[in-house]
Amino acid sequence: MSLKKFRPITPGTRFRVAASYDDVTTSTPEKSLVVSIKKSGGRNSQGKMTMRYIGGGHKQQYRIIDFKRDKHAIPAVVKTIEYDPNRTARIALLSYADGEKRYIIAPTGLEVGNTILSGPGIAPEVGNCLPLSDIPLGTVVHNIELKPGKGAAMARSAGTYAQLVAREGKYATLKLPSGEMRMVLVVCYASIGTVSNADHMNLTKGKAGATRWAGRRPRVRGVAMNPVDHPMGGGEGRSSGGHPRSRKGLYAKGGKTRSANKYSKNMIVKKRVNKRLSK
């Protein structure tokens, strides 16, 4: 995907950087793989607001994505590469030899007409999905399972990937985009390659309205609220609000949010460093 800049004929286009969508081959999704979703506006089933700053936005249809890739040893041909409004990556429509159609997250380099497979013992080529036990060390992967058979959970957003760095016994060690080194069972499946649309990180909305199109409302600062609404609210005139705190009164700015007793902590070999991997 390439980027598109605009002539500054309006304030909203002056700094806007948008996607060119030259990698998208069709604008009409597969009807059998689309379901309608109703916007919640940040409210739960009782009508009470449980998430602030959500509302409005363009109407969207959800594309059903195959994260399990459980049609083993059945070849599938890539029919289209499509835009998905529900995620940052592109999606690919597969047509299997038995007639079934499914959507998958499209990896970089996958093109219309390519044939891909999933299952044990297949070639580790871009788009193929196989268990970590069959993937050569050093291979870049995405759509990685955390629990066998549950479906992909890691490295699913645009441009992300992980690298298989070691394998010992029933565990494989992966280096994640955050720098974290994590052990995963070798029977878990992963797809070969990196996720498409890596230029997503370089997009610039250009105006506040573009954020509203995505269904996000303005976020009010805590120091601009009253004391009844936020621990940092109130004061005479403009004030700093004191020590930065969350709305619940917990210290903000760098505090640990992960539970120290989380069951999967033993799977983490090295903690993340908050820096993206460099190829």
Curated annotation (Swiss-Prot):
Keyword Hydrolase attached: no
Annotated stretches, region: Disordered:
223-279
Instruction: Please name the SUPFAM superfamilies in this protein's record.
Output: Nucleic acid-binding proteins, Translation proteins SH3-like domain
Which GO terms of type biological process are on file?
A: cytoplasmic translation
Bias (Basic residues): 268-279
Q: Which UniProt keywords apply?
A: Ribonucleoprotein, Ribosomal protein, RNA-binding, rRNA-binding
Provide GO CC annotations from the record: large ribosomal subunit
Q: Which InterPro entries match?
A: NA-bd_OB-fold, Rib_uL2_dom2, Ribosomal_uL2, Ribosomal_uL2_bac/org-type, Ribosomal_uL2_C, Ribosomal_uL2_CS, Ribosomal_uL2_dom3, Ribosomal_uL2_RNA-bd_dom
Kindly list the GO molecular function terms attached to this UniProt entry. rRNA binding; structural constituent of ribosome; transferase activity
Which purpose does this protein serve, as stated in its record?
A: One of the primary rRNA binding proteins. Required for association of the 30S and 50S subunits to form the 70S ribosome, for tRNA binding and peptide bond formation. It has been suggested to have peptidyltransferase activity; this is somewhat controversial. Makes several contacts with the 16S rRNA in the 70S ribosome.
According to the record's subunit comment, the protein's assembly and interactions are: Part of the 50S ribosomal subunit. Forms a bridge to the 30S subunit in the 70S ribosome.
Family, according to the entry, reads as follows: Belongs to the universal ribosomal protein uL2 family.
Name recorded for this polypeptide: Large ribosomal subunit protein uL2
